[in-house]
Amino acid sequence: MGLHVTLQGLAGLLLLLYALPWAEGGKVLVFPMEGSHWLSMRDVVRELHARGHQAVVLAPEVTVHIKEEDFFTLQTYPVPYTRQGFRQQMMRNIKVVFETGNYVKTFLETSEILKNISTVLLRSCMNLLHNGSLLQHLNSSSFDMVLTDPVIPCGQVLAKYLGIPTVFFLRYIPCGIDSEATQCPKPSSYIPNLLTMLSDHMTFLQRVKNMLYPLALKYICHFSFTRYESLASELLQREVSLVEVLSHASVWLFRGDFVFDYPRPVMPNMVFIGGINCVIKKPLSQEFEAYVNASGEHGIVVFSLGSMVSEIPEKKAMEIAEALGRIPQTLLWRYTGTRPSNLAKNTILVKWLPQNDLLGHPKARAFITHSGSHGIYEGICNGVPMVMMPLFGDQMDNAKRMETRGAGVTLNVLEMTADDLENALKTVINNKSYKENIMRLSSLHKDRPIEPLDLAVFWVEYVMRHKGAPHLRPAAHDLTWYQYHSLDVIGFLLAIVLTVVFIVYKSCAYGCRKCFGGKGRVKKSHKSKTH
């Protein structure tokens, strides 16, 4: 028996040794986006490491969330700004969000914010792509692929330069660039554009708005992305458009699904991994477990305005604190600003909180969120109704979608009062329909053949195994705009129809002249002779 076991073990060892060359891990270059974008991408990098792959994360020296960890190698590059300057810029942006004003003022200030952010990101990209020694090092490192967030096109420009396939990890790209770069149909009749706060069932006037709204964003989009085209053209030594550069991605991993998003057409290389950020859960620390247990039968409310916003103006903070003190639940509020003087005993301020783990606790009663997609998905995954305070970007659209599904209440953070927040919290906690609706969405979201994290890792490995996925790239990328819409075919067929009509018309006219014109002339000449 012992010999039999030994032979089995030896056979297994030989099989393992034989398979090792084929099971060798790949090498991935990761170019992330700052903030919550990185926090969910980090889970993919961790899982790739667990499966034997090597990851190198390329990031600027000045970051907020991207730190060195044991499951990847951090490669930094210098940037022309300091950590303090970067933080001050972010604080100025947040301050503008909480300032009231008319539409024109708000639009101009928002444009200025986006302009400043775009300038910072572009300068960072320029420093990277003009760093000859670093580019040479990356080129000689034999990476199998690039994993990047295309909201900053720099990662894809780098991938094109290195000549290796790319997997995109994103929520969306502003201005509909993602639709253009994937050649995915996007009818404005039922697919709402970003920032319109419309649903997929629109009235006539809403469809007019949906069609015209992108024109208002042309200026911002032009400023934000056109300069990357110049940078890409310079590096690749040929004229390229941003859409052309992005169109060569092998696979697009969208952090969405059709429980949260409205149904729409998709292309073969578009994969949906919504909820990827709430797959990994950990037990609560003793500190937070104690807070939850002390809440009694009333439970807890989790309050966070996202990874980038932890301070708000003092007046608004006091309004919020007053409202929170009026409900019986224990409030766990992620807040690093000045402690409001009217903070009630039921409200606990923390610099950081395990949001997903707290929402997954049976005592979680409600979630106050800024409506970022990560927070929304954590609310859906854990079945917790929401009070939403959207601040900027797609957060207004996210809040609208959850509100129309009866899973939460939306408040205007600039105009709301303490009474508004109190009533909203009591509504989502005490009205059972909100809990029932969010639980239904949670059930739909979880009913899937594979977890989002496993799906994302599968496609990353797929691209590495096959050195890209060109067979998933539609031929639409190779067509001109008039070929794509078959305008040349329509023109050709129209010309044939018009030619046939013209020939038939001329033939009929000629026949009529022959049949009737001759008789008329004969009669006329005969009449003249008799006279």
Swiss-Prot record:
Localization per Swiss-Prot or TrEMBL? Endoplasmic reticulum membrane
- Annotated keywords: Endoplasmic reticulum, Glycoprotein, Glycosyltransferase, Membrane, Signal, Transferase, Transmembrane, Transmembrane helix
Membrane topology classification: Single-pass membrane protein
Pfam family, any one: UDPGT
- The positions making up the signal sequence are 1-25
Q: Which CDD domains match?
A: GT1_Gtf-like (cd03784)
| Catalytic activity line of the entry | glucuronate acceptor + UDP-alpha-D-glucuronate = acceptor beta-D-glucuronoside + UDP + H(+); zolasartan + UDP-alpha-D-glucuronate = zolarsartan-1-N-beta-D-glucuronide + UDP
The similarity comment for this entry is:
Belongs to the UDP-glycosyltransferase family.
Function according to Swiss-Prot or TrEMBL = UDP-glucuronosyltransferase (UGT) that catalyzes phase II biotransformation reactions in which lipophilic substrates are conjugated with glucuronic acid to increase the metabolite's water solubility, thereby facilitating excretion into either the urine or bile. Essential for the elimination and detoxification of drugs, xenobiotics and endogenous compounds. Involved in the glucuronidation of the AGTR1 angiotensin receptor antagonist zolarsatan, a drug which can inhibit the effect of angiotensin II.
This protein's name: UDP-glucuronosyltransferase 1A5
Organism listed in the record: Rattus norvegicus
The protein's gene is named: Ugt1a5
